[in-house]
């Protein structure tokens, strides 16, 4: 049974044609991308590394990592989004290998094949995030890096990420997030530990509405990033 929610896949497929419009529904991802890219690169030193981007969608992060000199594979089960990613890669001249395959299936096929695994803004959209974390741990080489980002589950995150971002500021389409699937850092830490990974750093992501920009923060109450390593 595939670890995917058909409703979630359809939701992102319906918006596929807007992935690369920096002023449309995916504007927050475009604004966030430089922050997460520089954070990932600071840890993993991307040039020359073999990377798999799980839940890559339209390829915003995948392409930016490839632009830094990484050899990137992007996987997703939203085939319309992958089609957009493929087309944009051809237009930009930035080479990324895209494939419609589940993380668990790729892990079974290519265990220990990647220096870096990224799984950003994806765990809160699947029925079993622990299985995705385990697949990431299988995919990464000993000594390699695994990066996650997701949303904390508390009243503040509900008010800011759901009510604020989707209904008041309208930064995101209504229904983008299901609060019940948000993941507390302690829960993600348990998934990471059970998968045999070591958590190296956790950082929050703050949004500054007046400047309309994202920045790293020590506040993990809403959006947060986690860097992990597999033992050598």
UniProtKB/Swiss-Prot annotation:
Gene Ontology terms for molecular function: 2-polyprenyl-6-hydroxyphenol methylase activity; 3-demethylubiquinol 3-O-methyltransferase activity; polyprenyldihydroxybenzoate methyltransferase activity
Superkingdom: Bacteria
GO biological process, one term: methylation
Leader sequence residues: none
Catalytic activity: a 3-demethylubiquinol + S-adenosyl-L-methionine = a ubiquinol + S-adenosyl-L-homocysteine + H(+); a 3-(all-trans-polyprenyl)benzene-1,2-diol + S-adenosyl-L-methionine = a 2-methoxy-6-(all-trans-polyprenyl)phenol + S-adenosyl-L-homocysteine + H(+)
Methyltransferase listed as a keyword: yes
Associated pathway: Cofactor biosynthesis; ubiquinone biosynthesis
Pfam families, per the entry: Methyltransf_23 (PF13489)
Keywords for this protein: Methyltransferase, S-adenosyl-L-methionine, Transferase, Ubiquinone biosynthesis
Residues involved in S-adenosyl-L-methionine binding: 36, 55, 76, 120
EC number: 2.1.1.222, 2.1.1.64
Keyword Glycoprotein assigned: no
HAMAP family to which the protein is assigned, alphabetical: UbiG
Known function: O-methyltransferase that catalyzes the 2 O-methylation steps in the ubiquinone biosynthetic pathway.
Similarity section: Belongs to the methyltransferase superfamily. UbiG/COQ3 family.
Protein name per the record: Ubiquinone biosynthesis O-methyltransferase
Organism: Burkholderia mallei (strain ATCC 23344)
């Amino acid at each position: 049974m595939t670890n995917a929610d058909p409703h979630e896949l359809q939701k992102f497929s319906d918006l596929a044609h807007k992935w690369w419009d920096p002023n449309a529904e995916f504007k927050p991802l475009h604004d966030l991308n430089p922050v997460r890219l520089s954070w990932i690169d600071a840890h993993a030193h991307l040039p020359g590394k073999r990377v798999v981007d799980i839940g890559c969608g339209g390829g915003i992060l995948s392409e930016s990592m490839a632009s830094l000199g990484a050899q990137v594979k992007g996987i997703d089960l939203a085939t319309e989004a992958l089609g957009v990613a493929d087309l944009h890669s051809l237009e930009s001249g930035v080479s990324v290998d895209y494939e419609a395959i589940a993380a668990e299936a790729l892990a079974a096929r290519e265990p220990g094949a990647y220096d870096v695994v990224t799984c950003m803004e994806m765990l809160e959209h699947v029925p079993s995030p622990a299985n995705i974390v385990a697949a990431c741990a299988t995919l990464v080489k000993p000594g390699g890096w695994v990066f996650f980002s997701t949303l904390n589950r508390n009243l503040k995150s509900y008010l800011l990420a759901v009510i604020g971002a989707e209904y008041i500021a309208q930064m995101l389409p209504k229904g983008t997030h299901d609060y019940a699937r948000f993941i507390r850092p302690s829960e993600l830490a348990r998934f990471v530990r059970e998968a045999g990974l070591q958590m190296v750093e956790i950082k929050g992501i703050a949004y500054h509405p007046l400047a309309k920009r994202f920045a790293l923060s020590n506040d993990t109450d809403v959006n947060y990033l986690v860097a992990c390593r597999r033992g050598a």
